[in-house]
Amino acid sequence: MNLMKSSGMFTLTAIGSCRIVSPVKRAQPYFNFQANFKRIYGFTHTSSEALQQIRFILGLIDIPEKVRPFIFRPNVNYSNTDVHSRSDFYIIEISSQKKIMAYGFCLQINYLTRHFYEFFSQTERACMYWSLATQGNRHKLLAYLKDDPCFAGMSEDDRALLSNINVEQMDEHAIEQDMMEIVQLLGRDRVMFMTHVDAVTRAGTVILSRSRLIKNVDTIAARMDIPCVNPTNLMEKWGQKRALEKNGDDLTHYTDMFGDAIVAAIFKGVINNTNHHLDEGRQEKQDQIREITLSITKQLADGDIIAASQQLFAALRNQQQDPVLIQLRSVIFSHLGYYEQAYQDISDVEKIIGTTDSTLRCRLRSLHGLARWREALSTAEMMLSNEIEDEEVLTVAAGSADALQLFDKSYHYWKRVLLLNPETQSGWVNFLSSTQYFNDGNAFSEAFHAGIQSQRLNDTFMETALSLAIKFSDELIFMHALEQLLRHESEFALTVLSTIHDTGLVIRTAFCIKNMSYHQALRTSYKDKIHDVFEAWNNTALSLHSVDDFVSLSTSLAYSYSAFMVYPHSRISRFNNEVKMAWRDKLREMYEREDYENILAGAKIVWPLLKFDPVGTVYCARTLVNLGAWKDACTLAHMTLIRNSNITSLQSIMLRSIRHINNIPFLIDLIANVMSITLSFQNASMNKLFEKECRNVATRALKYVRQKKTEGRLDEALSVLISLKRIEPDVSRLMREYKQIIRLFNESRKDGGSTITSYEHLDYAKKLLVFDSENAYALKYAALNAMHLRDYTQALQYWQRLEKVNGPTEPVTRQISTCITALQKNTSGKS
């Protein structure tokens, strides 16, 4: 089959986003032209990006390697021998006024935020970064980045780039200068401009910055007497729901058919009048193909693949080389599992019209079906850089990264899959599993707790969690996963318990099983298997019992006490007491000769048991004080005082350690927890000292909050403020700080642009409501973002709470009505 283009045609180049580039490619067979994308390196949004692209294709500038990943499409390389022959006509789309510069070059925001996904995925950090990356704020930006752990973990080149970015909101004059130079470079009779659409949000309002830009581009083009197409009128004729993706809610992407209609309007209204005669027969053919496509697409959506196939193959008998029909055949082949044929078809289509968003999706499905993981990942990443971010694309990206053992990518992609659809159980398992390749357990802990919050887990998730908790020595997650698996009488859990050597986890296992025995009925056969595990641990304790080696003695105590906790038989009890007395004697002897390092080594082994032994705790806590380990000394004293609150020596160690600790969140939690046991402090001087330390910690915490505000770390400031409510009686002082945090966040988020998702905005709003559940700003903010996520149930609750706080108002009443209507439609749709 010969599907290659013929030469000598009218040539057309589109410079802009996928909104114009993809439909121009699709239109080639129907408007008798050839799309010329030689040396076009990627999508553009601002007038300055378009001008930079034009200078590059004309050979006036080169793009340095260090900025190419943030300007060029992924996996695209150009040689210096590539030549862009001037096209007969150029369409220049200008859809943004947010100009991002580094090293004198315009960067593409989607490529930038994809490369630095982890950095920009945190709402507060993204907001603060964009607000500081403006002219005159460089010293503040560098100070902010210097203390950011995510930034610190980047490569030297990445840190340098983020440090050198400058953001500018272009005004009308700057845009006009770019447009004038574009016309000068391309020629007045060869160029036209195009704007974005002035679409409305779910709240029924336009995006003001977009409206201003559309008006500016229209006005400038009119002054220059250059054609300009504003698709807004066409969108209004079509209806926003038909014109824009996601039933009109995606304000960024056009449906294929609306994009095709825009190009048709450009040819009929602009190009046909100046440069190129249209073939009416070809346009009629396009209309026929559109009707066939609509019918087949509906049949596929209804699951009637037989009818869709019959109609398609009937159409192909008359239109064997039509790229739209061949692409539909690729879709059907993928549905049927004929991935080789699907891939061949879509490859043929791309030879005719080039790569578009929809051909990329066909290619993605066929490559995934063929298990060609590297190509599938490359295709998925190209789609993501084109802002095509849905569950299918991210799942293929994550699964391909898994297969290629690129686990850092796998982690980030599974995380994004679960943001879109938290109900996929296999996604949670894969997400958790991908964290095993990180050096620390932070990613593992984050993934586990996110999974727990989703409440959509299974035993496979818990088995993965148990294994990784051992790897990262995370005792709390270990206990959580173990308890769940033991309830289900998991054989996997027993296998794991028989092989662990971490004494902390051995002790945690004993606590877990002892607590379960009061609430959970297990079968006798399973209990016998658990008993065998503890017998083995008791035998380990016997083998390690040595009064000459404190570390071995501590290990023996951990195993013997664990066995005793669950099975307090006389034999096990006697042996445990023997080990405990020998351990305590050895501890006293070592303390007297100031052998602090060995005491510390043994104390770490039996740490969870020390709270049951106040005598041993006093020696260990004093050892920690002598070593300057104030936080550990304080923690040990506190956990023992919870069980034995009247030990004055431990009270003194705990309270006098506080002044040496600089971890403010730790101190707030400590003070709040100690408040519950101070009634047992029988020493007046200890009570007086505690009151003094309470005031001191509260004052230090407020200073910490203000410092974090100054640094722009509003999330940290808010977290501390929420905790501080537990110990600070003067709430008015805290409320002042809270209102300032809201003001600063509101200012910074305006510069966050499209880098921040509604999920993250909603999470932040919920956090604001933790501090003040009746704050009007936070309620409105949460409601709007819940609506953007189509969570109308949650949005309705926020609007109703806002109405209760502020009283009925017309805008809130209208939003409540919108939510109720949406919920009724959802209910009727399901029935």
From Swiss-Prot:
InterPro entries in alphabetical order: TPR-like_helical_dom_sf
NCBIfam families hit by this protein: PRK15180.1 (NF011727)
General function of this protein: May be required for maturation of the Vi polysaccharide.
Source organism per UniProt: Salmonella typhi
Annotated pathway: Glycan metabolism; Vi-antigen biosynthesis; Capsule biogenesis; capsule polysaccharide biosynthesis
Name recorded for this polypeptide: Vi polysaccharide biosynthesis protein TviD
GO terms of biological process kind: capsule polysaccharide biosynthetic process
